[in-house]
Amino acid sequence: MPPAARAQVDLTAHPLPGILTPGPGSANVIIGFFPAWRGISLAAVAALQTAKAAADTAVAAAQGTPGFAAAQVSAAASMSTAISAAAGLADKHMCATPFPPTPHGVGVDITGSATVQINFLPAGRQGDTILEALGPPNTISKGELTVLIGG
């Protein structure tokens, strides 16, 4: 069972900012003095992955053309909208790792626990995948070792 993830303190694989932020995390579930991190509803994951695949295909098709930067900006905008709509009250991570000309952008935990919920959302854990608007997926690389969350 992986350690529980928390907003504002636990690490991500991408270096900028390197922690799960802005969150905000659960207002009433505190793990190791920090708010618990929550993923998106598992029912919303498939649609979000389909939108991400379409955005990635559009960006890849534009690579090496004068329209590459515009394709990235367009993909970032459409994915940010899709992520925000799918997220609802789930926690959002803002990745500033550059994917020139724009950063990876907003992302959400798409592999949260299927058996443990926090505020009716899947509990976030170390090793979970964060799908971001641009670029490759991110992962939660550190959680609270004293709280383990299953499935």
Set out the residue ranges of the language-model regions.
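Intrinsically disordered, low-complexity proline/glycine-rich segments
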Residues: 1-151
